[in-house]
Structures are given as structure tokens and as C-alpha cells.
């Protein structure tokens, strides 16, 4: 029997598959599209996602294909400098097309032994106390112990489970695509600058060789958003907002998106779970979607692996919903607020100017930047040291870097005292004796996702906390 079927071969599904494979879980990824998409949905990784790649030893691959940008200016496109001394070793945004991100994650998943089947569409599922039966469009039936729906905003898995998806429908829509432009670059730049003085959802960004990424408000909301717009729709809307269509032609791909925000009522139903856009949708303001999905996978992977491998403590798998559902709710509010600030209406523009003024205060700028980059997230792991529940930033050690010790996806005790022991949890938790000038606590216990589960120097206190996240001791 397959351990876990992942429905959906996008970044969330591929990241989840890799996390599961690090723990020896037999994973099958089912992707309904026969070949990788050329549609560039997202354009970059925020700080926390960059840290995630570094924690798994993947960052150099991504840096080789991306470009670093300042983190400032991502909240509603308000142009402000990056805050000073952001609490990370990676204070930048990595510009990288999602098509490249997908390819790198697929390569990683395959290297780890993941089977990826393309052209396989899940159309039905049934579960019992022992597993899940998945039915494919060609009539094939597959049996697995668990199944995770990473199949996007129109998730078949979510619909088959009957999980509610409440929220706000789209009120406005935006056209997005890549196409050739015949107008001179200087003309494009001048017209775009003028239009964007009042219409923030308008832009033409050069990609090279005469190709531009074009974004322009649509006329109304389409009855069926799964139907791609036409090049003529782009021309019409460009003329409406800019007085010219810039001579657009030869589209690579065309799409549309709205400002809908929806959040699944629950992330788990028995042996089936949801992650990524299958669990939450929102407008793309602030570049949150792909990053939110990657971090869902990073949170879920080790917990589901623990369940499959038989050492998960009670409630560990349910903590995926407990921890990630509020994060998504916060992101929905964040993206909705930013989208409102893009409106050309006088009211939202007045608020935008006020927010811009407030961001001149360092604390306000830092607060919003930390929310955009997701480094402010703190899970409820109990009371105690201020580090508890927070993700641990990378720090320099005497013998290397902290994140170099987390590539295997296990728990980690970083012990600056040399007096502690992980005892009967050594098969699940690595023990590193090393010191860092950047760390002012004797020792920290990190979960496989890099969040701090314990901090201190008392051996008995450590042993009392290990079972909550790593199950019963062995031996």
C-alpha cells in the first residue's frame, strides 16, 4: 500500500512529497496536467520560504536561478526601504518564476524517490479506518494510508470531502498575461508611470526580447474564471486605461484573477488533509500564495510522516490545522487589506497615503514587513522563553551554520552546554554540541520545521518536553 498520495503536483504538493521522503514515507504525486505549465503564477520567494529552502540544503539551487531584491515595497506596492536589521540571515526577496520553482522542487522530490504521475486526474475518494481509496479519471483505483489535497483553489479533494469553503466572492477582476509589445520601451515606461499614479492594478513589466508581463483591470467579473481571456480583451482594457494597447500580440499565456478570499473550515477529515490553495485562496497582493503553501507543506510533512512511521504523539497531526489555519486567516486579511489600498477610489487612496506616512515609522514598517515575509509567526507551544513557538533564524556556530544541521528534516537539540542528552529520542532528534555568539540561551530544541519547542538548560525539563513533539522514548 502507498503511504501517502499527494493530489496536485504544484509547489505545495512537491514540497510536501520531499518532506515526507526525508522520513522514508512512500509517496505518490498525482498531477492532472500532462506536462508542466508555462503559466508563471508567482514571481518570488519571501524570507521565510528562503529560510525553508536553506534549512533543507536547497537554497543554492534557487539562488542560481533567481535574483535578490530588497524586501521593502511589497506591502500594497508602497515604496519604502527595508527595515534595519531584519531578524534573518536572508533579508531579501528572491525573484524567481514559479515555473522554475516548480522544476527545482520536482527535481528534488524525484531525487528523494518520489513517484510523480502526470496526466492523472483524481475524480473520487473513499476512506475507512485503515486508508483511502482514490479513483482516477481512467478508472484506476489506488489505495493509500493517507491522502493530501494540494490541488488548487478549485480543489476536487476539498469538494469530495464536503468541507466548507466560506469567504468573500470576487468583486473585481484583473487580467494577467505575458505577450509581445511593439511600442518602444521608453513609451511603455512613460505611459505606465502616468497610469499607475491612480490605477495601481495596472502594469507592464519587461521580461526581455520584447516580451512583457501585463496586468490590467478587467471589465467586470467573468462568469467562468476557468476560461482564459483573449488578447482582444487585453487590448480593449489597455486602451481604456492607457489610451493605447501598446501593440500587444503573440501571447505566451493569458489568465485572470479576482479578489476572492476563502478559507476551508477544516484542514483535516479523517485520513485526508488539505494544503496550499486547496485550503485557502486570496488575491495575489504581497506575493503570499505560493509562500503560504510551501509553509503549509513544511508544517505538515514531518507530522504526517510521524503518523505514518508510528511515533506521532496524540494530537500531533491535528496540530497542523491548529497552527496553520490561523496563519491563513491572517494572510487573507493581509491580502484583502492590500487589495483595498490598490483601489483608485478617493477613500482607499486617502487610506493608502496615511499608511504610507505611518510606514515612515520604523516599528510600523518592520511590523508590516515581518507579516509579508512570514517571519513573525509564532505557534502556541506553551509558556516560557521568548523563543518558544518562533522559527529559529540561522545563526553562525563555531563549526558552521545552524541550518546546515537541519538538512535531514529531523528534530535538533542545539546544546551550548555539552551537558544535555536526547536519550531515547536519538532516532528522531539530532544532538549538536556547539556554540553561537548570536544565541543567548543555553540550549534549544527545534522541531523538524525549525520552530523552537523548548529552551533552557535543565535535562529533566527537556525530557518532559520531548514527548509532546516526538512521541515516546525508545528503549
Q: Model-predicted segments: where are they?
A:
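Helical substrate-recognition/capping region of FAD-dependent monooxygenase/halogenase enzymes
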Residues: 1-3, 7, 23, 77-79, ...
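Core Rossmann-like FAD-binding/catalytic domain of the broad FAD-dependent monooxygenase superfamily
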Residues: 1-352, 356-359
Amino acid at each position: 500500500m502507498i503511504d501517502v498520495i499527494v493530489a496536485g503536483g504544484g509547489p505545495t504538493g512537491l514540497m510536501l512529497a520531499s518532506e515526507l521522503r526525508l522520513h522514508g514515507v512512500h509517496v505518490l504525486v498525482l498531477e492532472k496536467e500532462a506536462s508542466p505549465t508555462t503559466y508563471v503564477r508567482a514571481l518570488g520567494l519571501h524570507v521565510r520560504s528562503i529560510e525553508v529552502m536553506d534549512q533543507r540544503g536547497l537554497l543554492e539551487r534557487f539562488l542560481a536561478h533567481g535574483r535578490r531584491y530588497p524586501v521593502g515595497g511589497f506591502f500594497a506596492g508602497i515604496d519604502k526601504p527595508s527595515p534595519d536589521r531584519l531578524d534573518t540571515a536572508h533579508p531579501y526577496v528572491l525573484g524567481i518564476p514559479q515555473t522554475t520553482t516548480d522544476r527545482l522542487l520536482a527535481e528534488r522530490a524525484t531525487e528523494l524517490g518520489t513517484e510523480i504521475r502526470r496526466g492523472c486526474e483524481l475524480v473520487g475518494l473513499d476512506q475507512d479506518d485503515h486508508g483511502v481509496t482514490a479513483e482516477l479519471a481512467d478508472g484506476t483505483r489506488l489505495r493509500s494510508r493517507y491522502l493530501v489535497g494540494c490541488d488548487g483553489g478549485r480543489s476536487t479533494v476539498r469538494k469530495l470531502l464536503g468541507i466548507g469553503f466560506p469567504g468573500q466572492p470576487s468583486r473585481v477582476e484583473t487580467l494577467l498575461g505575458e505577450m509581445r509589445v511593439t511600442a518602444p520601451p521608453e513609451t511603455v515606461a512613460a505611459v505606465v508611470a502616468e497610469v499607475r499614479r491612480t490605477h495601481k492594478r495596472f502594469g507592464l513589466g519587461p521580461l526581455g526580447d520584447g516580451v512583457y508581463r501585463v496586468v490590467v483591470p478587467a471589465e467586470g467579473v467573468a462568469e467562468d474564471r476557468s476560461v482564459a481571456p483573449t488578447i482582444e480583451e487585453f487590448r480593449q482594457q489597455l486602451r481604456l486605461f492607457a489610451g493605447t494597447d501598446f501593440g500587444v500580440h503573440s501571447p505566451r499565456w493569458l489568465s485572470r484573477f479576482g479578489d476572492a478570499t476563502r478559507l476551508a473550515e477544516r484542514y483535516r477529515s479523517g485520513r485526508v488533509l488539505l494544503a496550499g490553495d486547496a485550503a485557502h485562496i486570496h488575491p495575489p497582493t504581497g506575493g503570499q500564495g505560493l509562500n503560504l503553501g510551501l509553509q503549509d507543506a513544511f508544517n505538515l510533512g514531518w507530522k504526517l510522516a510521524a503518523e505514518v512511521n508510528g511515533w506521532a504523539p496524540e494530537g500531533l497531526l491535528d496540530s497542523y490545522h491548529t497552527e496553520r489555519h490561523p496563519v491563513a486567516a491572517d494572510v487573507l486579511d493581509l491580502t484583502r487589506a492590500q487589495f483595498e489600498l490598490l483601489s483608485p477610489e478617493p477613500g482607499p487612496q486617502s487610506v493608502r497615503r496615511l499608511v504610507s506616512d505611518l510606514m515612515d515609522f520604523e516599528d510600523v514598517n518592520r511590523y508590516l514587513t515581518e507579516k509579508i515575509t512570514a517571519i513573525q509567526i509564532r505557534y502556541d507551544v506553551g509558556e516560557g522563553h521568548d523563543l518558544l513557538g518562533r522559527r529559529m533564524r540561522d545563526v553562525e556556530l563555531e563549526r558552521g551554520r545552524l541550518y546546515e544541521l537541519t538538512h535531514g528534516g529531523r528534530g535538533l537539540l542545539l546544546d551550548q552546554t555539552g551537558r544535555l542528552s536526547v536519550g531515547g529520542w536519538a532516532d528522531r532528534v539530532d544532538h549538536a554540541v556547539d556554540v553561537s555568539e548570536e544565541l543567548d540561551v543555553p540550549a534549544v530544541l527545534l522541531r523538524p520545521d525549525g520552530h523552537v519547542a523548548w529552551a533552557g538548560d535543565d535535562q529533566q525539563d527537556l525530557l518532559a518536553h520531548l514527548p509532546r513533539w516526538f512521541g515516546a522514548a525508545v528503549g
